[in-house]
Amino acid sequence: MNEQLQKILDTNRHHIQGGQLPTYIPELSKANKEALGIYVADLDGNEYGVGDYEYPFTIQSISKVVTLLLALSDRGEKYVFDKVGMEPTGDPFNSMMKLEVVRPSKPFNPMINAGAIAVTSMIKGDSQKERLERILGFFRQLTENPNLQVNQSVYRSEKITGDRNRSMAYFMKDVGIMQNDIESDLDLYFNQCSIEVTCKDIAKIGRFLANGGVLFETGQQLIDEKYIKMAEAFMVTCGMYNASGEFAIKVGIPAKSGVGGGIMASVPKKMGIGVVGPSLDEKGNSIAGVRVLQKMAEDYGLSIF
């Protein structure tokens, strides 16, 4: 499989030039635009990696899937979805527009920034430190990587430039969606987005989802399968920002992207896939990464549709 993956990588590398590095978070603009890597972890225990699969990047919006699972596990679906909706928006991920004009005032889904911030605020813990430790511990379990850490430079950069997220959070407090100290909740959110990962790490998250919430190494049912199905449904409808519909048609795999250049994909009952390519298209998705996943879906018949 490595040979086939390498060929897919090589034939799609030229797409990198059509994208840009993000500039609104200064630290992310320092990424290697030319990096491109794939990692596959399947349910038979096989793992394959080609290209820059060890290239470190911050998880960014891919983290929204993980914190949604933790919040659902902590609070249950009624609590979570009373405060956050289930519908795609068609708007950019950092848009506030529908939050203000649509009634009732709640974020449309957990994959946009407003929804993800609200979800993070639901995670239990007696202190800020405990909540962050729970989030980090959960990520370490799902990636099977006990060494995951927050990239402090990116975290600081997110915090300094996070005024739009701040304004959304204060609006949500005003309408009763968020109750905690807003700066503490935002700090948690900036931390979770700044966790440094590789393709291998996010492929393992994808495999966890593909395995129905069962940890591959231990066989432990960590998260109820109904929550996994919800997360995968959100990945299909909202996971690739406002390119989710096109991605569902052309690729047909539940996936979640992040502006760090990562895409985490999960093929139910088959495999998890991690792709990195920091050069982004105008929607905020890895421009070469999307093409790589499209070719993989075609070659291996991975579409769920």
From Swiss-Prot:
InterPro entries: Beta-lactam/transpept-like, Glutaminase
Swiss-Prot/TrEMBL keywords: Hydrolase
Gene Ontology biological process terms, A to Z: glutamate biosynthetic process; glutamine catabolic process
Presence of the UniProt keyword Nucleus in the record: no
Reactions catalysed: L-glutamine + H2O = L-glutamate + NH4(+)
GO molecular function: glutaminase activity
A family per Pfam: Glutaminase
SUPFAM superfamilies given in the database record: beta-lactamase/transpeptidase-like
Gene3D superfamilies: DD-peptidase/beta-lactamase superfamily (3.40.710.10)
EC numbers for this chain: 3.5.1.2
Record: residues binding substrate: 61, 113, 158, 165, 189, 241, 259
Subunit structure, interactors included: Homotetramer.
Family, similarity comment: Belongs to the glutaminase family.
Descriptive protein name: Glutaminase
Organism this protein belongs to: Alkaliphilus metalliredigens (strain QYMF)
Lineage: Bacteria, Bacillati, Bacillota, Clostridia, Peptostreptococcales
Gene name per UniProt: glsA
